[in-house]
């Protein structure tokens, strides 16, 4: 769910998932049957604060990306459309990824578009960069879910990129549905 209203009681709405229920006359009316948890709920109190969201806008300066790679372990790039790297940033992304990949830096591609999610496979530049660096892609996860999950996983898996990537794609309470 994503917070869509600032002051209303019905502030949250489902994104890329059907509405589960509503409250009417003090009762919960479920649209989908209740599904019990597969495992007990766990709480993670130790998280990494070294995650940064970088929202691309037209004219974004490449040196910002260099600064973020220097100062954060994980950068979530919120890109345009299905999620790709603009030509103006491509050289910087390659340079920074080559420079930092051995030190366990994580780059995640997301989209600024709320519905349907990202798909880096649509355009050649997205295909290439995803393949070259085994980038993690957010697909249909909300930005809030992406950031929260990464904060937990960075603390758990640290520099083990493969383990972190595998855990990222493991579905938690329907947070990711369309990972390819």
Model regions: which residues?
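C-terminal non-catalytic interaction/assembly regions of soluble proteins
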Residues: 82-180
């Amino acid at each position: 769910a994503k917070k869509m209203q600032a002051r209303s009681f019905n502030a949250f709405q489902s994104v890329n998932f059907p509405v589960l229920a509503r409250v009417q006359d003090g009762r919960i009316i479920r649209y989908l049957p209740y599904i019990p948890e597969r495992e007990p709920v766990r709480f993670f109190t130790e998280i990494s604060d070294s995650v940064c969201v970088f929202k691309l806008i037209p004219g974004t300066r490449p040196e910002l990306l260099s600064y973020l790679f220097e100062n954060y372990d994980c950068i979530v790039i919120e890109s345009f459309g299905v999620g790709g790297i603009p030509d103006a940033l491509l050289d910087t992304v390659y340079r920074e990824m080559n420079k930092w990949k051995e030190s366990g830096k994580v780059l995640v591609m997301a989209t600024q578009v709320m519905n349907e999610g990202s798909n880096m496979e649509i355009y050649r530049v997205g295909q290439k960069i995803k393949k070259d660096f085994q980038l993690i892609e957010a697909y249909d996860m909300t930005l809030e879910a992406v950031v929260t999950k990464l904060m937990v996983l960075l603390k758990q898996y640290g520099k083990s990129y493969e383990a972190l990537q595998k855990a990222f794609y493991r579905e938690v309470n329907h947070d990711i549905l369309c990972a390819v």
